[in-house]
């Protein structure tokens, strides 16, 4: 019986090709096959480094059906790599279902660390990095996005979001409206690329800068927002505790309204706590 292979989770550059580590290059050269989010994109990356390996497209629409097939190959002794289009796989990218299935099957899963847009942005933001929460992409629909931001408005930890270029302006508008125009934030754009910019200031200032400069609405974005003041977070925590008790005896809307009146916390922030 053959020894099972290894699934390597390989981080790839988010812009600057020089950020692909020597170890990552070695792994990509030696595995049997590379599972890639977009094989066309990954093929270009491999060509730059003179690497030729079979590729298998693994994305959000087929991961659940392909996982079993990939696990079978790993069990047979093949070692495979998983990459995303940019950065570390699984971080707002496919791969979770495969990694979970591999671990359940007793396959060794090992990280090959490297670039990550959220960590790169946080490291240069000047905002507290000892405690933070990563929210990925906010909902595309305005109502759902605002509801999510309302729930996060009193989060005391530094908040990190990804955002697309066609939504960056309206996202900053919603952030300023819901979090408060004076909340400090950072907008990091095109990190490690030629047109990299890192803007900082109040949400109101950033909203204006991005709205008035078309170039600042192009590319890939990481938004980092200062956490809420401790007293605001304490209100939310207490409000959610009281809401949980009250909703056992009252309709959710009535329980939230009463808990908000008792604690001074925003009513909408108490749902789902």
Swiss-Prot record:
Keywords assigned by UniProt, alphabetized: Cytoplasm, Methyltransferase, rRNA processing, S-adenosyl-L-methionine, Transferase
Catalysed reactions listed for this entry: cytidine(1402) in 16S rRNA + S-adenosyl-L-methionine = 2'-O-methylcytidine(1402) in 16S rRNA + S-adenosyl-L-homocysteine + H(+)
Gene Ontology MF terms: rRNA (cytosine-2'-O-)-methyltransferase activity
Coiled coil regions in record: none
Record's keyword annotation contains Phosphoprotein: no
Location of this chain's protein in the cell: Cytoplasm
Documented EC number(s): 2.1.1.198
CDD domains listed in its UniProt record: RsmI
GO cellular component: cytoplasm
Family, per entry: Belongs to the methyltransferase superfamily. RsmI family.
PANTHER family: RIBOSOMAL RNA SMALL SUBUNIT METHYLTRANSFERASE I
Record's function text: Catalyzes the 2'-O-methylation of the ribose of cytidine 1402 (C1402) in 16S rRNA.
Name listed for the protein in its UniProt record: Ribosomal RNA small subunit methyltransferase I
Organism of this sequence: Xylella fastidiosa (strain Temecula1 / ATCC 700964)
Gene: rsmI
